[in-house]
Structure formats: structure tokens, C-alpha cells
From Swiss-Prot:
Protein name: Aprataxin and PNK-like factor
Biased composition, class Basic residues, residue ranges: 304-315
Coiled coil: 487-511
Phylogenetic classification of the source organism: Eukaryota, Metazoa, Chordata, Craniata, Vertebrata
Pfam families to which the protein is assigned, alphabetical: FHA_2, zf-CCHH
Ranges annotated as biased composition (Low complexity): 345-355
Motif (KBM): 182-191
């Protein structure tokens, strides 16, 4: 991609970049010209093939000034004139003068940046000493020696694990000549990071191999790790570089506990077999304690889940309890796996694991549900019931169920504590919840005399000669008036007259 061009006003102002192709210049916002002596279409600038040319298209001419000459010359209209970087042109004789500037392309900019980086790297490498570059193979050889020593120790103690480690060591040895054959020289800051990464990788490789296993294999790996740290210290002290000493400190911090154990055993000059026995005993004790810790929370979890499931009786709530116990057991199992990795084999063989507990819990739920099955209320619609809600089927029985047609609600006996519905069997409410909460037994026959008389079974003690009682009583006086009253003829005539008067008034109002 070729570079572009820019126009720089001589009077000052922002540069104007020219797009590839033709651009019409004149009065307007592009060049910021407001003088009416300049036309809106004064000239055409064309960028093509990495070159710039101008063609005046207005009667007022444009002026050209080369970089060598100092005088503006008028251009002929409708003729192309090539402009080079450093040349100038103007739209008026003494005003609106623009200078041509070239913009380098992206490829050229990348090339210049690369060249400048190469020069900077060469200067830096010439100024810096060669010690870090020379120490690089020493560090790689030191790392290989450390890895070799760990390999020898592991082949003596654990031949099964040595096969995989030999493959890793061969891969590392294959990578070392590739690093040595590279001729590319890195900057100093990249070399520093590379050296620090290698120093950190030595203890990471030696420590990462001692992760899994139990019993004598772990003891042998610990001993091989101690041997590697001792040999590494000797070689790192002989090298005498600050970076190697930092790696020594890292390995020393990681193997601090194992060094203390090794020093106590070597000071007493005890045989390796006895030390291995003591270490294996301590590790077995740790494994047993971890297994006991794992058993306790599992048993507690089983008790809690069984207690929760026993309290739930409906099938819907039993499902919720089962899901809750599953979630709790899965969460507890994850936490136990994170706490101990060495006791995985024992915990897997343990009969009190979450899966067996869950199976027992489901069995107990099924047995409890069968034993405590409650007789449901018979649905009033019977075979014509259209409801499909499972809760409805839990509370009401239908034709085909074992408890359909019998006693509607368990507990409708003398021990039923539910309140009695005031309407009894004649209750018109059809809400099933109402029938569950209230009893609907036959109501006792009301005694009208008992309700009217306050003193039931007691003799009448009223004084019949009391004047107060005589005043309240009213004598019945028969009359000739009949209850079916019929209006007389006079009343009918009055009503007819009134209706006629009303109609006459309405007729007069219309006129």
C-alpha cells in the first residue's frame, strides 16, 4: 500500500488529509476557505499510484511553487500538473497557500520500527556483559542434573513410577539442545524473566511428582526429594550466581519439614528400614484419623436426613425431603473429597457413604408412607371429576381407589377435635378445605319449648292476681272488618276523576 498526502496551510491551521482518488477543492469546510473570490469548484486534486496532481477548473487560475523556486507561477486551466512532496500551490496570488506533505505507508512504518528495534537490541547487547547469556546453559545443566538425581533415587525406591518420570526427563533433554541451537538473541528484560522462570521450574518439577500415592511409595519419594535438595545445594553453591541462590531458597522453603525429619534420623544414625517403618506408622495414623473424620459427618448427615424424612408424610413433601438429602449428601461428599485425598480408597469401601444412606432413606420413606397411609375424602364428583391437580388426588379419593366410598375423613369419631359446622349436613359449601376443617354431622333436634322457656322443669311461681301482668295483657276484640279489603265505589270514582284531570292537563300542555 502506497503512502498518502496531506495539505499543510502556510498561514497555520490543521492539516488536511487527501483521500485516494479525485478531490474537489475550493471554498467550503474542507479547506476552511470563506473568501468569495475562490469558487466552490476551483481545482481538482487526484491521488493515484502514489503520486499527486492538480488541475484548475475555474477561470481564476491556481498558482504553483516548486520546492526549489521561490516564486508562485500561474497554472493553465484544465491541464494536469504533478505535485511532489515539498511543493506548494495556492488558490489566490497572495493567500491560501498549501504545502504538500507525504504520509509513509504502514509497511514502511513497520519496517522502520523493526530496524529501530534491531539497532536498539544490538546496542543493548554490545553494552551489557555476557554473563547472563553464559549462565543459561549452566542453569539448564543444573536443572538436568537435579532431575537426573531425582530419577536415580526414584529408580532405586519406586521402579513403577520411574518409567513415567524417565519419559518426562527425556522430553526435557530433547528440548535442551533445541534451546541451545537457537541463534535469536532476546532483550535483557526477556532474558531476566526467562532465567527466573527456569529457576522456579526446578522445584516445581521435583515437587510436583510427589502428589499421589500412599505408604512406602510416598516415603521413597520424600527421600528422593531430600537427595535432590542436597545435590542441588552443592551444585548451586558452586555456580555462585544470585539467581541460583534464589532457587536454592525456594527449594529449601518447600522441603523444610522433610529436611528436619531427615536431620533427626541421620543424627541418631538409625537404619533406613526403621525410619521407613516409623514414617509409615505415622502416615497410617493420619489416614485412620482422616477416615474417622469422614465417617462422623456422614453418620450425622444420615441421621439428619432420616429425621427430616420421618417428619414429612405427604408424597409431595417426601420428594422435597429426598431432594434435600441428595443435595446435602452431594455437598458433604465434595467437601470430604477436598479435605483428604489419601483416604479415598478407605472412604469408598466404607458402607456409610452418601449413596447407601440415600438408598436407606428412600426405603424408610416408602415404608413410612405405606404404614401411615391416610384415608382420603371421597370426591363429590366421583367418576365425573375433571380435575388433574395432583394435590386434589392427594386429598380426595375417586372410583377405583381403595379408600373411596368408605369413611370420608379419618378422625370423624369421638376424638375428632374439629369444630362443628353450624349448617351440618345441609351445608351448601363445596370447598374441600371447608370440609376438612369442619365436621358435618347430623344436628340434634331443637326443642322449641326449651328455647322459649328459661326455667325448664321448674314450677310456675307467677302471681296471677298481679296488676302488672294484667296491664300488659290486651283483650281480643273481634271486629267486622275482613282482612281482604275491597275499595268502595266512591273511591273508584275519585280515582277515575283524578286520572281524567291529569290527562286533560297533559292535553292542554301539548297545545
Amino acid at each position: 500500500m502506497s503512502g498518502g498526502f496531506e495539505l499543510q496551510p502556510r498561514d497555520g491551521g490543521p492539516r488536511v488529509a487527501l483521500a485516494p482518488g479525485e478531490t474537489v477543492i475550493g471554498r467550503g469546510p474542507l479547506l476552511g476557505i470563506t473568501d468569495k473570490r475562490v469558487s466552490r469548484r476551483h481545482a481538482i486534486l487526484e491521488v493515484a499510484g502514489g503520486q499527486l496532481r492538480i488541475k484548475p477548473i475555474h477561470t481564476n487560475p491556481c498558482f504553483y511553487q516548486s520546492s526549489e523556486k521561490s516564486q508562485l507561477l500561474p497554472l493553465k486551466p484544465n491541464l494536469w500538473c504533478y505535485l511532489n512532496p515539498g511543493d506548494s500551490f495556492s488558490l489566490l496570488v497572495d493567500k491560501y497557500i498549501f504545502r504538500i506533505l507525504s504520509i509513509p505507508s504502514e509497511v514502511e512504518m513497520q519496517c522502520t520500527l523493526r530496524n529501530s528495534q534491531v539497532l536498539d537490541e544490538d546496542n543493548i547487547l554490545n553494552e551489557t556483559p555476557k554473563s547472563p547469556v553464559i549462565n543459561l546453559p549452566h542453569e539448564t545443566t543444573g536443572a538436568s542434573q537435579l532431575e537426573g538425581s531425582t530419577e536415580i533415587a526414584k529408580t532405586q525406591m519406586t521402579p513403577t513410577n520411574s518409567v513415567s518420570f524417565l519419559g518426562e526427563n527425556r522430553d526435557c533433554n530433547k528440548q535442551q539442545p533445541i534451546l541451545a541451537e537457537r541463534k535469536r538473541i532476546l532483550p535483557t528484560w526477556m532474558l531476566a524473566e526467562h532465567l527466573s522462570d527456569q529457576n522456579l521450574s526446578v522445584p516445581a518439577i521435583s515437587g510436583g511428582n510427589v502428589i499421589q500415592g500412599s505408604g512406602k511409595e510416598e516415603i521413597c519419594k520424600d527421600k528422593s526429594q531430600l537427595n535432590t535438595t542436597q545435590q542441588g545445594r552443592r551444585q548451586l553453591i558452586s555456580s555462585g550466581s544470585s539467581e541460583n541462590t534464589s532457587a536454592e531458597q525456594d527449594t529449601g522453603e518447600e522441603c523444610k519439614n522433610t529436611d528436619q525429619e531427615e536431620s533427626t534420623i541421620s543424627s541418631k544414625e538409625m537404619p533406613q528400614s526403621f525410619s521407613a517403618i516409623t514414617l509409615s506408622n505415622t502416615e497410617m495414623n493420619n489416614i485412620k484419623t482422616n477416615a474417622q473424620r469422614n465417617k462422623l459427618p456422614i453418620e450425622e448427615l444420615g441421621k439428619v436426613s432420616k429425621h427430616k424424612i420421618a417428619t414429612k408424610r405427604t408424597p409431595h413433601k417426601e420428594d422435597e425431603a429426598m431432594s434435600c438429602s441428595e443435595n446435602c449428601s452431594s455437598a458433604q461428599g465434595d467437601s470430604l473429597q477436598d479435605e483428604s485425598q489419601g483416604s479415598h480408597s478407605e472412604s469408598s469401601s466404607n458402607p456409610s457413604n452418601p449413596e447407601t444412606l440415600h438408598a436407606k432413606a428412600t426405603d424408610s420413606v416408602l415404608q413410612g408412607s405405606e404404614g401411615n397411609k391416610v384415608k382420603r375424602t371421597s370426591c363429590m364428583y366421583g367418576a365425573n371429576c375433571y380435575r388433574k391437580n395432583p394435590v386434589h388426588f392427594q386429598h380426595f379419593s375417586h372410583p377405583g381407589d381403595s379408600d373411596y366410598g368408605g369413611v370420608q375423613i379419618v378422625g370423624q369419631d369421638e376424638t375428632d377435635d374439629r369444630p362443628e359446622c353450624p349448617y351440618g349436613p345441609s351445608c351448601y359449601r363445596k370447598n374441600p378445605q371447608h370440609k376438612i376443617e369442619y365436621r358435618h354431622n347430623t344436628l340434634p333436634v331443637r326443642n322449641v319449648l326449651d328455647e322459649d322457656n328459661d326455667n325448664v322443669g321448674q314450677p310456675n311461681e307467677y302471681d296471677l292476681n298481679d296488676s302488672f301482668l294484667d296491664d300488659e295483657e290486651e283483650d281480643y276484640e273481634p271486629t267486622d272488618e275482613d282482612s281482604d279489603w275491597e275499595p268502595g265505589k266512591e273511591d273508584e270514582e275519585k280515582e277515575d276523576v283524578e286520572e281524567l284531570l291529569k290527562e286533560a292537563k297533559r292535553f292542554m300542555k301539548r297545545k
